[in-house]
């Protein structure tokens, strides 16, 4: 049966919640925190491995950050290959699964990507400075041409680090200096962190920053 009193109470509760939400939105509308997005190929949550246990949490700080913030999982059909396709999925919201069989986002005409809303593009429209760092060269996926359509103010690859790192710019042997930043076979995540700090020190006083790094 229709309960008029119950429905009226429910509507009042909804109205109260909406008013509270509007007040929260108004109070945070002017906040523009710096945002850093990192896709790291060298990190994963080892506690999610099936059948593996640890006496102590090896990622206690990471899990603490997850608990006090917003966290979740991202699912992709790519595993062990096609890293740039995963990047484009995240930055554009497009899913490789729905493309024609045998095609990937990386094979798109760069001009086609320009018509879609993107994460860096939305930040750019909101008044952010947007920068992309890749800890390798541009010899595989043609990232420079593809990502130039996504809304980045500037992009930096291994051959461009002197534009970010003052020590690299002053080094007598540029590539020799970069060799000191290698851990294993590739440039370390620690060096990516240093470069983010350099970008913040160069541009952080002007506008809020969106920094995207791929290792």
Where are these regions (language model features)?
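Conserved functional hotspots at enzyme active or ligand-binding sites that engage polyanionic ligands
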Residues: 4
């Amino acid at each position: 049966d229709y309960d008029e009193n119950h429905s009226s109470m429910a509507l009042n509760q909804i109205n109260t919640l909406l008013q509270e939400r509007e007040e929260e939105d108004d109070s945070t509308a002017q906040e523009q925190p710096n945002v850093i997005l990192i896709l790291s190929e060298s990190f994963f949550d080892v506690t999610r491995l099936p059948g593996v246990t640890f006496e102590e949490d090896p990622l206690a700080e990471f899990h603490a950050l997850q608990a006090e913030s917003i966290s979740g999982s991202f699912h992709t059909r790519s595993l062990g290959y096609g890293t740039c396709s995963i990047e484009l999925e995240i930055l554009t919201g497009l899913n490789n699964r729905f493309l024609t069989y045998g095609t990937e986002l990386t094979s798109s005409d760069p001009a086609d990507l320009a018509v879609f809303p993107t994460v860096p593009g939305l930040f750019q429209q909101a008044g952010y400075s947007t920068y992309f760092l890749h800890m390798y060269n541009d010899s595989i996926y043609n990232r420079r041409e593809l990502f130039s359509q996504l809304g980045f103010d500037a992009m930096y690859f291994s051959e461009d680090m002197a534009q970010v790192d003052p020590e690299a710019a002053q080094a007598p042997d540029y590539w020799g200096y970069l060799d000191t930043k290698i851990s294993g076979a590739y440039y370390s995540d620690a060096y990516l962190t240093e470069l983010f700090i350099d970008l913040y020190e160069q541009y952080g006083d002007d506008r809020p920053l969106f920094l995207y790094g791929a290792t």
